[in-house]
């Protein structure tokens, strides 16, 4: 499974010199687009495809992702979560599950400085074939496979400081069905995290609101110091997605439900 914010490649216009100098790569867009681009329905194109294209052309996060060479607008969600919760630090070991097309992996590489000597280590893993990201070990493998945790620890030379998951199954339009499918991925990602996280580690995962997340949160509270929920500004309006941030991993020996829920 891959990040829900579609296969957008890097590139795009360079923008003006003043604009380029006023922002660092990885910063969120400021302001809004002045002109609205309206797309006509072409012959053979479905109305839903036209609406999607029009939304993309008028989305400041899509435009800014292209300008900065980021592979998806979803990268800004991780940027905003990191700025709020201080998730990524130089030298950290990070795994990005469902990494394709690589937007979150790009941000993890930059903020852990994995391209630098003595920097961090980043592994991106996805069941789909995907283009690698410089500074990361990019694996095409199903993280639900029994051998995946051992494979990851081998690539990391040890346990992990942060597990990221922006995975979402293709939506059906039926809210409860979509909720259950995303929660299945979230639960699988958490069970994977239990096997690879180092003490004190953290976990970030997308869920869809829908009422069945209680059992997972209860389990997480037994193993982490604090659980938070957040909806970053880059999440689209009307989207049911929210992110669970678990910090202070204690492991399977955590015992009773002592974690704080600071939603």
From Swiss-Prot:
Disordered: annotated span: 1-34
EC number: 2.1.1.166
Single GO cellular component term: cytoplasm
Catalyzed reaction equations: uridine(2552) in 23S rRNA + S-adenosyl-L-methionine = 2'-O-methyluridine(2552) in 23S rRNA + S-adenosyl-L-homocysteine + H(+)
Record-level Gene Ontology MF annotations: rRNA (uridine-2'-O-)-methyltransferase activity
Chain residues that bind S-adenosyl-L-methionine: 102, 104, 126, 142, 166
InterPro entries: RNA_methyltr_RlmE, RNA_MeTrfase_FtsJ_dom, rRNA-MeTfrase_E, SAM-dependent_MTases_sf
Catalytic machinery residues: 206
Any Pfam family: FtsJ
Superkingdom per UniProt: Bacteria
Keywords, comma-separated and alphabetical: Cytoplasm, Methyltransferase, rRNA processing, S-adenosyl-L-methionine, Transferase
Compartment(s) of residence: Cytoplasm
Family: Belongs to the class I-like SAM-binding methyltransferase superfamily. RNA methyltransferase RlmE family.
Reported function: Specifically methylates the uridine in position 2552 of 23S rRNA at the 2'-O position of the ribose in the fully assembled 50S ribosomal subunit.
Name assigned to this protein: Ribosomal RNA large subunit methyltransferase E
Organism: Rhodospirillum rubrum (strain ATCC 11170 / ATH 1.1.1 / DSM 467 / LMG 4362 / NCIMB 8255 / S1)
Gene: rlmE
